[in-house]
Swiss-Prot record:
Cofactor: Zn(2+)
Listed GO biological process terms: L-methionine salvage from methylthioadenosine
Note accompanying the cofactor annotation: Binds 1 zinc ion per subunit.
Main location: cytoplasm
Pathway(s): Amino-acid biosynthesis; L-methionine biosynthesis via salvage pathway; L-methionine from S-methyl-5-thio-alpha-D-ribose 1-phosphate: step 2/6
Family membership: Belongs to the aldolase class II family. MtnB subfamily.
Annotated binding of Zn(2+), by residue: H116, H118, H201
Localization of this protein: Cytoplasm
Name of protein: Methylthioribulose-1-phosphate dehydratase
Keywords: Amino-acid biosynthesis, Cytoplasm, Lyase, Metal-binding, Methionine biosynthesis, Zinc
Positions with a binding annotation for substrate: C99
Amino acid sequence: MSDIKDGNNDHLVESDDPEHPANLIPALCRNFYSHGWVTGTGGGASIKRDNHIFIAPSGVQKELIQPHNIFVLSYPTPKYPPSARQYIRKPLKLNPSACTPLFLAAFERGAGCCIHTHSQWAVLVTLLVEREKGPEGCFEISNIEQIKGIPRGKGKGMMGFYDTLKIPIIENTAFEEDLTQSLEEAMEMYPDTYAVLVRRHGIYVWGDDVAKAKTQCESLDYLFQLAVEMHRLGLPWVKS
């Protein structure tokens, strides 16, 4: 932590601007808590602004996070080992997010914000896909209006009603950081994706900026809930 100066660089998280990352992350987490996405201290969010990465802490009730709880990393920074990460602000008595290397993987793809939730609908679709398609299957859905809220890929515009949305699924691990390699492999296999599902765990969603990451996360959760209900009614996710 040699990069942390006297005073812990508290000025990095002190701002009256509601659009400042240190204010946006607590606001996002409160919003996600109201949806049931980050209960029991689970989940998290991170925002990249210029050469700084702002990250919600680990093990903190997400609806109670305050700006002074936010970690700040210099960017770029190594993903591994954890001791090599360039923290320039570290809240006292709090632990860095175990999601950090996964967030960094999204930022390496040009993301401006990455969100991790423990959405029950996300978990359920991973189980349904496993049962119907096996462990190698991905989530697919088509001919649903909300698909238009998801990008086709970087610089490729938004998906259309008749497109088939595909979201890769990776297996969960005992420790969050151990998901990093599988997440990066899924990103390589699905270069246009803006999300990766984690079986029996949740989802990582990223966007070019905070608003896009948030709305894409909302659109995906809508689609997952709809997919679970469609399956219950015997309706196919992909229209033939």
